[in-house]
Amino acid sequence: MSVTLRFRSREGTFRVAANPDADFLLVLEQLLSKISIEDVQNLYLSDKPNSKGELANGLCGKTVTELGLKNGDMLYASYEAATGSNPDSTTNITTSTNNHNSGSISIGHISIPTTTSGPRKVTQLPVDDVLEKDEGLIKRPLTKFCRHGAKGMCEFCSPLPPWDANYRKENAIKHMSYHAYLKELNELKNSKHNSSSYIAPLEEPNYSILLNCNEGHQPYPKGICSKCQPPPITLQLQKFRMVDHVEFATSSIMNNFIDVWRHTGVQRFGVMYGRYEPFDKVPLGIKAVVEAIYEPPQSGELDGITMLPWENEAEVDAIASELGIYKVGVVFTDLTDSGQKNGTVLCKRHKDSYFLSNLEILMAARNQIQHANITKFSSSGQFSSKFVTCVISGGLNGEIEPRSYQVSTSAEALVRADIITGSTQPSRLYVNSSNDRRYVPDVAYSELNEYGLEVKSNAKPTFPVDFLLVSLTDSFPVNPTPMFDTDSNFVIENRDFFNELQNLHAVSKYLNADTSGKGTSLCNFHFLVYLKRTNILGAQEFDLLLRFVRERQYEDYLHLVESPGWMTLITILEQST
């Protein structure tokens, strides 16, 4: 059901019909068609007739409902006409902190931070710094409609912006990439020609009630107002994704991980270490390159996994960091043999059941909250996460295949606010009730029916998990260049339950099997972690080992094998065997 918003300007009063769940940008586009300006960058809005207006483009990215606007509300527009005849008609931005570098603009109950100092000074991931400098324009060849030479350009061959919807549709790209989404928002909210103010384009949703509201009433649950309570929530499929693709550096990484199920029939959980790189199959895309899967302490079962305390997690992270890799996600198996004795497995996850269960959705959301994405384009310095969740299960033809996912920013916000929990149906999430510490607003989800019409449904008491899910693609490289050696397999950690033990005997056997004389066997993540736990090598010697693995300089290998610590290791191995 649409609402009508009224806009009063010096040219008259105009009525604009709007969908309550539509982006406010659509409302502004209708308004611009009625007044004598063409650029939203020059439009200012206020909810009071005699107050100075605020930049309208700062409200883009919010829905009409989130801005607290209702049917019949009046907003006051000020701007400089296209003729430029009246300079006094332009309203300057003012904030609650005049003569300072930052403040906020507000309409309804939404407050949007502004600053004159530009983006925040934070340390982003290298891939973000690279893609930030890339315009990401989609080049197009000359067409039969072009009437110019090879060096000319027209509307039929000019480059498209990386967020172009038609390009995504034609190339079957389901989600916009994170940096394409960021550039689109930045284009809407910040003018390239106006450096006097800056609005952070990214803002995480917040569905938690403000327990320390200062509007003069008692704290919740004894008092509540429109300033401290979250707005109604409408869940929709997220149109962008933080990571577009997951690439396993080599197929042996996956095969070694699945071997536990092949030998025992129990499920397995692992943490994926790697890095993020640009992904050229999607405009301004990002891929997670998985170099190793570490298996933390766990108790596997036929239909689940019980995680145990991971005492050396910080040590594993430190070794990975020295090698230039870090946690990029988690992976787990959900495999059941088909019983046909031909290597096939049951297909349990499909469109008629679920792709991630409700508990897995909650786990993914908590992991993403724990591994936040650092960005300079958010007022808080972070926005969502690049942490991925991969499940290895059966495909439609009984094959074993990985599938990679993330959950939406709405899922993260719902978990932060403790609004959702699991239910007895794996494909549905339960909406909690309000209590003394938790206020649950109206929650709905919106989808298109078979006629292409938008239908909104009440999410209480349960709603489908698919509205919080973001799917990624995954693959193995055609010409793999892994960081770690794939020909030598050291015993993987925490597999004692089926007689695979990490001990000095395993180290001796592993090193003796390397006859290359080039130290290739040292380039194994599981071996490095175990060797660190033995404390045989000194700190400088272990750093030398990591430098050799990272840079593959033969001189470093020679210095390592001639070091006192390495000599001690060889002596201990000879005596232990």
Swiss-Prot record:
State the organism named in the record.
Scheffersomyces stipitis (strain ATCC 58785 / CBS 6054 / NBRC 10063 / NRRL Y-11545) (Yeast)
Q: Which Gene3D superfamilies match?
A: Phosphatidylinositol 3-kinase Catalytic Subunit, Chain A, domain 1
Q: How does it sit in the membrane?
A: Peripheral membrane protein
The protein depicted here goes by the name Nuclear protein localization protein 4
What gene is this protein translated from? NPL4
- Any single GO CC term annotated in Swiss-Prot or TrEMBL for this entry: RQC complex
Q: Which UniProt keywords apply?
A: Cytoplasm, Endoplasmic reticulum, Membrane, mRNA transport, Nucleus, Protein transport, Translocation, Transport
- What's this protein's family per the entry? Belongs to the NPL4 family.
Asked if the keyword Ribosomal protein belongs to this entry, the reply reads no
Q: Which residue ranges does the record assign to the MPN domain?
A: 246-383
Task: State its role.
Answer: Involved in the import of nuclear-targeted proteins into the nucleus and the export of poly(A) RNA out of the nucleus. Has a role in the endoplasmic reticulum-associated degradation (ERAD) pathway.
Q: Does the keyword Membrane apply?
A: yes
